[in-house]
A protein has these predicted regions:
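ABC ATPase nucleotide-binding domain helices that frame the ATP-binding cleft
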Residues: 44-47, 143
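Helix-to-loop junction immediately C-terminal to a conserved catalytic motif
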Residues: 51
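ABC ATPase nucleotide-binding domains
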Residues: 32, 71-227
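Non-catalytic connector elements of ABC transporters
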Residues: 247-328
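Conserved ABC transporter NBD signature motif
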Residues: 59-67
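The feature captures the beta-strand-to-loop junction immediately N-terminal to the Walker
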Residues: 36-38
């Protein structure tokens, strides 16, 4: 697949503080790439450098193999969507969406053609005459996205665009965004601290920590084969067993619980159930290990057949293939 954006030895410093240490990254055309990490990890700074709102201290950013260092944001073939929608309150939905095309003096016939297309894409045709105050938060976000895609940018940059919405609405819009990206074929670069959001939408995820990309891979590879201790503990839930100079990561869903007097060959550890949390489709069971200052989490699903209670002594085990060995 064709490379659309390339970051070559990019570094960002503010005074003497290195915010983004030097690294390189290539992004493919039509890809949905998510920059995922905790607050302050540098993901928004990186996005702003791609957009042109911040300049890298060293290194170069290329779009279609052309350097962007001296190209202002408004001349880059990119648009950006923020968490704050920044809609014009006195304009209707269609007036907000058309604003950029009017500023570029695109012909009226072409404006209307593109407007009808994007209104269908974002499911706002019936709401085109409403003003922002007459819309829900999710509808306002659709307007912001429509305004960003109507001029067919090569790249769409999204800085936590769903962060202000409630959980159920976020879930719904995640699916809509992914389908929209597939239909349009536009490269999406998406910033979030929400792991579930990143997993649901991305072709690849770049997990960031302290300005560095710890790992970049597909959601499945990030989850099943973390390369660093940070990725293993930041993405999802994990049990980290530190023994013999290594870290072995085992996901809670891979931990099996057995009666303490069952087949000893299955057992790796013995312990006592310290707590259990009911979450509808599963229970999180916490086991305090014997002779170790460690609590292990296991997932128990409906139909497992054993109803463990707090205080029960249990044995735990897992397949060796479910361990991920990580550097210390």
């Amino acid at each position: 697949m064709k490379k659309i954006i390339h970051l070559d030895s990019i570094e960002k410093r503010f005074a003497d503080t290195v915010v983004v240490p030097s690294f390189s990254l290539s992004i493919e055309e039509g890809e949905f790439l998510t920059l995922l990490g905790p607050s302050g990890c540098g993901k928004t700074t990186l996005l702003r450098m791609i957009a042109g709102f911040e300049q890298p201290t060293t290194g170069e950013i290329f779009l279609d193999e052309k350097p962007l260092s001296h190209v202002p944001p408004y001349q880059r073939d990119m648009n950006m969507v923020f968490q704050q929608y920044a809609l014009f309150p006195h304009m209707t939905v269609e007036q907000n969406i058309l604003f950029g095309l009017k500023m570029k003096k695109v012909k009226a016939v072409e404006q209307q053609k593109r407007l009808e297309e994007v209104l269908q894409y974002v499911q706002l045709t019936e709401l085109r005459k409403r003003t922002p105050k007459q819309l829900s938060g999710g509808q306002q976000q659709r307007v912001a996205i429509a305004r960003a895609i109507i001029n067919n940018p090569r790249v769409l940059l999204l800085d936590e665009p769903l962060g202000a919405l409630d959980y159920q609405l976020r879930k719904s819009l995640q699916l809509e965004l992914k389908n929209l990206q597939k239909n349009l074929g536009i490269t999406f670069i998406y910033v979030t601290h929400d792991q579930e959001e990143a997993m649901a939408m991305s072709d690849r995820i770049a997990v960031m920590n302290k300005g560095r990309i710890e790992q970049i891979a597909s959601p499945a590879e990030i989850y099943n084969s973390p390369q660093t201790l940070f990725v293993a503990t930041f993405i999802g839930e994990n049990n980290i067993f530190r023994e013999n100079g290594t870290n072995a990561a085992v996901r809670p869903e891979k931990i099996k619980l057995y009666p303490i007097d069952s087949d000893k060959d299955k057992h790796k550890k013995l312990g006592t159930i310290a707590d259990a949390v009911f979450l509808g489709n599963l229970r999180k069971v916490f086991i305090r290990l014997e002779g170790q200052d460690m609590t292990v989490m296991a997932h128990q699903y409906a139909g497992d057949g054993l109803d463990w209670q707090v205080g029960d002594q249990v044995a735990i085990g897992w397949a060796q293939t479910d361990e991920v060995i990580l550097p210390c």
